[in-house]
Amino acid sequence: MKKSFSLLEIILVISLIGFLYTMFLPKTKINHIDELSSKLSLYLTHLRYKALIDDKYDSKDSLWHKKRWTIKFLRCRESVGGIYYTIYSDKNKSGHPSAEDSLKDPLTNKNIYTSNICNENSLNSKYVLLTKEFGISDVQISCNETTSVGQLSFGSDGEIYSKLSAFNNESNEDFFLDNERLW
């Protein structure tokens, strides 16, 4: 008479218990707002760090302030609809962000950028597409003084600015007198 379990019986019972456990395990829903807030928090910390180590001030360049590191929330084309954001330093001072100007995601090394076409691609982070990825239809920034949905720019002194000035800057003091500074 056989008084012990065979290896096959033990494996079968463990597999059955594992299967039943996964069937009745409560399903956890992914909270998109938490995911977005953690991504934005990571990106803002990285952006501020980048601005602190990358001083854009140049006394010979009257448009130096356009090169500040900036996060800008924008609307997709009307045919597409939605909202996206991009993080960039406008190196050519054109006023329009480009993939070359954008900050890289520190985790995936993808550009934190998209154009107003709002298509996902392998070079850019998918987390910038707020409407497509997270279902967000509106963003309100109380300090917005631009034509975009919202914008925050970081100076090398750690200050946050609500807009990039269009004024010519004679000196640093004149710049602070002409621009709104957020504390």
Show which residues each predicted segment covers.
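N-terminal helix-rich module
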Residues: F19-T45, Y49, I53-W183
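Glycine-centered recognition micro-motifs in short, flexible terminal segments and loops
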Residues: M1-Y21, L25, K29
